[in-house]
Amino acid sequence: MGRKRLITDSYPVVKRREGSAGHSKGELAPDLGEEPLPLSVDEEELELLRQFDLAWQYGPCTGITRLQRWHRAEQMGLKPPPEVHQVLQSHPGDPRFQCSLWHFYPL
């Protein structure tokens, strides 16, 4: 009785050489020295609203607008951030600002 066959026996053994520049898997890519672009005012405000959507302490956000959620949290004494209210008041008709992060996902 011979050696027990393994599934890897059917695949050829491939030995890899290091690249011409001597790169190996453990090395990081060189730093290009580029910094990320600063966010625009709208992008900063949208990020603030996304963080508000993800903050569970103000209650669920599905099925209502961000402004409705902010008012509900205020009525319940949960002290929602006033910056969120200011952003929502400054963009009254824009669905990007008024609708929650989950608005475009079906319930």
Swiss-Prot record:
Annotated keywords: DNA damage, DNA excision, DNA repair, DNA replication, Nucleus, Ubl conjugation
Post-translational modification: Ubiquitinated; undergoes 'Lys-48'-linked ubiquitination in response to UV irradiation, leading to proteasomal degradation. This modification is partly mediated by RNF8 and by the DCX(DTL) E3 ubiquitin ligase complex (also called CRL4(CDT2)). Efficient degradation requires the presence of PCNA and is required for the inhibition of fork progression after DNA damage.
Subcellular location: Nucleus
A GO BP entry: DNA biosynthetic process
Top-level taxon of the source organism: Eukaryota
Motif (PCNA-interaction protein motif (PIP box)): 1-16
Principal location class: nucleus
Pfam families to which the protein is assigned, alphabetical: DNA_pol_delta_4
Biased composition (Basic and acidic residues): 15-28
Region called Disordered, residue ranges: 1-35
Gene Ontology CC terms, in alphabetical order: delta DNA polymerase complex
Complexes and interactors: Component of the tetrameric DNA polymerase delta complex (Pol-delta4), which consists of POLD1/p125, POLD2/p50, POLD3/p66/p68 and POLD4/p12, with POLD1 bearing DNA polymerase and 3' to 5' proofreading exonuclease activities. Within this complex, directly interacts with POLD1 and POLD2. Directly interacts with PCNA, as do POLD1 and POLD3; this interaction stimulates Pol-delta4 polymerase activity.
Job of this protein: As a component of the tetrameric DNA polymerase delta 4 complex (Pol-delta4), plays a role in high fidelity genome replication and repair. Within this complex, increases the rate of DNA synthesis and decreases fidelity by regulating POLD1 polymerase and proofreading 3' to 5' exonuclease activity. Pol-delta4 participates in Okazaki fragment processing, through both the short flap pathway, as well as a nick translation system.
Similarity remark: Belongs to the DNA polymerase delta subunit 4 family.
Name of the protein in its database record: DNA polymerase delta subunit 4
Organism from which the protein derives: Bos taurus
Gene: POLD4
